[in-house]
UniProtKB/Swiss-Prot annotation:
It holds the Pfam family PTS_EIIA_1. It comes from Staphylococcus aureus (strain NCTC 8325 / PS 47). The keyword Transferase applies. This is PTS system glucose-specific EIICBA component. It catalyses: N(pros)-phospho-L-histidyl-[protein] + D-glucose(out) = D-glucose 6-phosphate(in) + L-histidyl-[protein]. It is a multi-pass membrane protein. Keywords: Cell membrane, Kinase, Membrane, Phosphotransferase system, Sugar transport, Transferase, Transmembrane, Transmembrane helix, Transport. It comes from the Bacteria. The gene is ptsG. One of its GO terms (biological process) is D-glucose transmembrane transport. One of its GO terms (molecular function) is protein-phosphocysteine-sugar phosphotransferase activity.
Length: 681
């Protein structure tokens, strides 16, 4: 139960990042527009006092401000999409649910425009609807409910006479019903919840603000490895605390108050739960990266310089710290704990210095410049001496502990032991043993990319052993293990099943052939690494980076590098001259090898293995030679969209030695059959 809850919290935390991602763009418009209207910038740049420039500045301020004014709705849409695997139907359902809930609450409580005029009432006008103000929490609740409706009903079957409403079309219908029902308990209990939140936040800030900001920074940093920090900071940024703007509206949340004060040019009082990250992200962590570089072995310093240099620059400019933090988190947990303590102390230090800095994305230089230096509303320059002190502390603490405790930070690792080897015949036995043996297997399954095993006791699974056997990654979700063996996953599963049933695995790829093939493949790989391979688009549609595919195996490139296409037509065509290497039994995936030796996997949709071949028509067979543009597979696009998690189609280079992909038309935009997709080297 606890593991399941933890997994759900991780998903919610990740989903919150989608609506948060729009805030930097809104903040950029608002910050520049506000700065152009301020006396400070006009003093240095008199030409911006021109009437036309000021009109543009006001438009920019309004365009940025409207995003912050409608954050609850944006959170509803974003959380719904995030928890539903990226499907837009969930967003439509969330919008339907959001307006129905607010309209029903307003009518039930008899809220009128006159009621809204009283700030103490807790009422507000949302999208023109007089209703109860539930804030960002209300949006998150609706988003989660819409995602639940989607995941529950997206593939529902109805009688033939109601067939039009089956599948994904049923989701907004259910959402309309559930949000109408939800409105009544929300109308009755939310005022009490809101009063409790206000009392808690007021007491927290009034009792001992210094302790509060220290604990906030410390706990938020400790939660990063678990992906729960987005859940933790959301109430502080969007709900806790209150401030009345010039129009008499009550604004809640440290970040929202800060942005509103910047927009109005008011005296700054917010930023306590954001500003502590500037010294750490701009100075402390880059200094830690320098310490890691200086303690690396001489023969590894060139590689570490590239790794740490890019991570440090990312932290300084944008405030994205995970690439740097995860480089030492697991090998040196004490360093991460000290890092969390220093983060909390940074919040406390800036609070004691009476600074008021905020951001829309993170504590990097970009936000520091736009929302600190340009508005010039607080003593922003004090961050620099504090940051320099932090740089010295981080550098010497990290360097001393890395050397003293012999931490294996990047560049200090021992030479890797030789990976375990197993022939094709031995591999299923070895994988079964690594999974804890037959008695530990509760359920065995596979798809085109991974071996899916539900085990009785996760502690018996040898994760490093699975990686030594060729798994490019191992995912753990409760007692469910997913070992990424690529296209051979289904074969391994089939042979493991035979072993468990007491059958003999007969010559899956004969021993002699396997040895010969290994030599040939090794030679091919060394040769192909020097070649250039042109891959043309096998589908027509919209190009999407792998990082945006809502499946961890593809987004984290466990199968290999590549790109994805969201198809607009139900055809897959050969992307080059070559041969069909493998077709998955359920027809949803095909493996190809080009005449130049490039191995490519085309995986139509996500979780389409569950369709058992329905909606797919093959036009080729394994071993068949194909020419570029030959029709490989037809698929029913509407059926996949209605019955699968997503129609997005990853296109993966499965050779680990080919890592340089040049996307000729970029990783976004539309593409058609035959257009050059990328060049692989």
């Amino acid at each position: 139960m606890r593991k399941k809850l933890f997994g759900q919290l991780q998903r919610i935390g990740k989903a919150l990042m989608l609506p948060v991602a729009i805030l930097p763009a809104a903040g950029l418009l608002l910050a520049i527009g506000t700065a152009m209207q301020g006396e400070s910038l006009q003093h240095y740049l008199p030409f911006i006092q021109n009437g036309g420039v000021q009109t543009v500045a006001k438009l920019m301020t309004g365009a940025g401000g409207i995003i912050f004014d409608n954050l609850p709705m944006i959170f509803a849409l974003g959380v719904a999409i995030g928890l539903a695997g990226g499907d837009g139907v969930a967003a439509i359902a969330a919008f339907v649910g959001y307006i129905i809930m607010n309209k029903t609450m307003g009518d039930f409580l008899q809220v009128t425009p006159k009621n809204i005029g009283d700030p103490a009432s807790g009422y507000a006008s949302i999208l023109g609807i007089p209703t109860l103000q539930t804030g960002v929490f209300g949006g998150i609740i609706i988003g989660a409910l819409a995602a639940w409706c989607y995941n529950k009903f997206y593939n529902i079957n109805l009688p033939s006479y109601l067939g039009f409403f089956a599948g994904k079309r049923f989701v907004p219908i259910m959402m309309a019903t559930t949000s109408f029902i939800l409105a009544f308990p929300m109308a009755l209990i939310w005022p009490t919840i809101q009063s409790g939140l206000n009392a808690f936040s007021t007491g927290l800030l009034d009792s001992n603000t210094g302790v509060a900001v220290f604990l906030f920074g410390f706990i938020k940093r400790l939660l990063i490895p678990f992906g729960l920090h987005h859940i933790f900071h959301a109430p502080f940024w969007f709900e806790f605390g209150s401030w009345k703007n010039a129009a008499g509206e009550i604004i809640h949340g440290d970040q929202r108050i800060f942005i509103e004060q910047i927009r109005e040019g008011a005296h700054l009082t917010a930023g306590k739960f954001m500003q502590g990250e500037f010294p750490v992200m701009m100075f402390g962590l880059p200094a830690a990266a320098l310490a890691i570089y200086h303690t690396a072995k001489p023969e590894n310093k060139k590689v570490v310089a590239g790794l740490m240099g890019s991570a440090a620059l990312t932290s300084f400019l944008t405030g994205i710290t995970e690439p740097l933090e995860f480089s030492f988190l697991f090998v040196a947990p004490l360093l991460f704990f000290i890092h969390a303590v220093l983060d909390g102390l940074s919040f406390l230090t800036l609070y004691l210095l009476d600074l008021h800095l905020g951001y829309t994305f993170s504590g990097g230089f970009i936000d520091y410049f736009l929302l600190g230096i340009l508005p010039n509303k607080t003593q922003w320059w004090l961050v620099i001496p504090v940051g320099l002190v932090y740089a010295v502390i981080y550098y010497f603490v990290f360097r001393f502990l890395i050397v003293k405790l012999k931490y294996k930070t990047p560049g200090r690792e021992d030479k890797q032991s030789q990976a375990a080897t197993a022939s094709a015949t031995e591999l299923p036995y070895a994988v079964l043993e690594a999974m804890g043996g037959k008695a530990n297997i509760k359920h065995l399954d596979a798809c085109i990319t991974r071996l899916r095993v539900e085990v009785n006791d996760k502690s018996k699974v040898d994760v490093p052993g699975l990686k030594d056997l060729g798994a490019s990654g191992v995912l753990e979700v409760g007692n469910n293990m997913q070992a990424i063996f690529g296209p051979k996953s289904d074969q391994i599963k089939h042979e493991m099943q035979q072993i468990m049933n007491g059958q003999v695995v007969e010559n899956p790829t004969t021993m002699e052939d396997d040895k010969d093939e290994t030599v040939v493949v090794a030679e091919d790989k060394s040769a192909t690494s020097e070649l250039s391979h042109i891959v043309h688009a096998p589908l027509t549609g919209e190009v999407t980076p792998l990082s945006e595919v809502p499946d961890q195996v593809f987004s984290e490139k466990m199968m290999g590098d590549g790109i994805a296409i969201k198809p607009s037509q139900g055809e897959v065509r050969a992307p080059f001259n070559g041969k069909v290497q493998m077709i998955f039994p359920t027809k949803h995936a095909i493996g190809l090898v080009s005449d130049s030796g490039l191995e490519l996997l085309i995986h139509i949709g996500l979780d389409t293995v569950k369709l058992n071949g329905e909606g797919f028509t093959l036009h080729v067979e394994e071993g068949q030679e194909v020419k570029q543009g030959d029709l490989l597979i037809n698929f029913d696009l509407d059926y996949i969209r209605n019955h699968a998690k997503s129609d997005i189609t990853p296109i993966i280079v499965t050779q680990g030695n080919i890592t340089n992909l040049d996307f000729k038309q970029g990783e976004h935009g539309n593409i058609s059959f035959g257009d050059q997709l990328f060049e692989a080297k």
